[in-house]
Amino acid sequence: MLIIETLPLLRQHIRRLRQEGKRVALVPTMGNLHDGHMKLVDEAKARADVVIVSIFVNPMQFDRPDDLVRYPRTLQEDCEKLNKRKVDYVFAPAVEEIYPQGLEGQTYVDVPGLSTMLEGASRPGHFRGVSTIVSKLFNLIQPDIACFGEKDFQQLALIRKMVADMSYDIEIVGVPIIRAKDGLALSSRNAYLTAEQRKIAPGLYNVMNSIAEKLIAGNRELQEIIAIAEQELNEKGFRADDIQIRDADTLLELTETSKRAVILAAAWLGQARLIDNQSVTLAQ
């Protein structure tokens, strides 16, 4: 496994891979890797000849400076995990390598609508930062496929739209959420939880299951369903942030013709903002 930190060296290897006709898969990450990331790697390995994992804590997508500062950086441990998984390349550039002129005045990629709705409404600039760094990685690495986790449901939808709108010839693969045995979605931010909070954390998944059961039963009183769910979260020790029930295919409001719904949930537990989602097939 080769660790690449500079753009010239990356370009050199990408040119060689292209000349050899290799099928390349990209797994973009911010590091602090867990089993959910390893599932992305496994999916990439099954679909390509060469797997490149990027590790870059992207300052452009953080809406709070304190969150950027305390985001876990575990490059050595991450590389050890990826080496055991027989990843071919790790691209781990410094911020100055990606943004040599700094962030101010930086050209960016924005996806209208999807970047400012739902999660984007509460985190201004976040999705613009995501789409910009992913676009830069696509331009640099020129992958045939790229793997993203379905835990970040809106992010995946945004990347799919960007790829379609910008005519990237890249297959976007969504990989299902990996959960702990108690239902908690694996996330780098789970590291912020205390031992006591970790015991409470699966409550978010349980509340989503309760919402799903109501939707499957035909209940469409969405405001009431959401209000009850927020109350349940608060009673469990969370601070409910945002719960939405949307059309899973468009992320717009549910209509009578919607075939699938997605429950999008975000809640604070101590210093950790946990997000999760669950898709539900609706009775027609």
From Swiss-Prot:
Superkingdom of the source species: Bacteria
EC nos: 6.3.2.1
Residues the entry annotates as binding beta-alanine: Q61
Gene3D superfamilies per record: HUPs, Pantoate-beta-alanine ligase, C-terminal domain
Main location: cytoplasm
Quaternary structure, from the entry: Homodimer.
Source taxonomy: Bacteria, Pseudomonadati, Pseudomonadota, Gammaproteobacteria, Enterobacterales
Any one Gene Ontology cellular component term annotated for this protein: cytosol
SUPFAM superfamilies: Nucleotidylyl transferase
Biological process annotations from GO: pantothenate biosynthetic process
Enzyme class: ligase
Protein name: Pantothenate synthetase
Keyword presence, Nucleotide-binding: yes
Entries under PANTHER family matching the protein: CYTIDYLATE KINASE/PANTOATE-BETA-ALANINE LIGASE, PANTOATE--BETA-ALANINE LIGASE
Keywords carried by this UniProt record: ATP-binding, Cytoplasm, Ligase, Nucleotide-binding, Pantothenate biosynthesis
Gene Ontology MF annotations: ATP binding; pantoate-beta-alanine ligase activity
